[in-house]
Each structure stands twice: as structure tokens, then as C-alpha cells.
Amino acid sequence: MYLRAYAKLYKNKGAMTPGTTEETVDGMSQAKMAKILEAIRYERWRWTPVRRVALPKRNGKMRPLGMPTWSDKMVQEVIRSILEAYYEPQCSEHSHGFRPTRGCHTALTEIQNVW
């Protein structure tokens, strides 16, 4: 499961962006992943603070952005995949928000086909 999360996050351009630590995908190894898994298993895992940065928007305002460490991103992805595997089958077929392969466009298509 961790290898699947690693593979998914590795493809993302943001994988090389450090959070509060200088940790990026380059520093990840099987040994490091095993340490993270052991910390979670024995309830010693601690989330690290998120690095906050402000990105300028076109209208001149700033957009706040939180950048977690790479280890935190990986643990979040594992949790997301576990929760998704459990809850996705229980969702209504007519529900489109925040679901894999669904969104506002699929909702509009369904409305157009039904009505």
C-alpha cells in the first residue's frame, strides 16, 4: 500500500517541493518507508507542522498554501486510499463531488441525460 502511495505521489511535480523539512521524494527509501510504517504501527507517528507560503494571484491578492513534508504526504495518501476503498462502494451513483473519475462535468452530463 505504501509503495502504491509512493508511486502515485512520485508522478506529481510537487514531490520535489520540500515542506518544513528538506525531505523530498529523492530522500525516500525502503528503509525510510519501513520506519514510517513502524512508527504508525506502534502509535509513535507524529505529524509535522505544515510550511505556509503565500502565492500571488492574478488580482494582486495572495493565496495561502500549506506544504506538508513528504512523509506526511505519503501517510495522507495511504489514509485516503484506505478510506476511499471503504466508503466509495457505499456512495450513491448520483453523487459526483470529490469522487474519483467524477466531478461537476459528470454531474451535468447525468442531469442532461436524465432530464
Task: Report the location of each language-model feature.
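Conserved pre-catalytic core of RNA-dependent polymerases
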Residues: 1-115
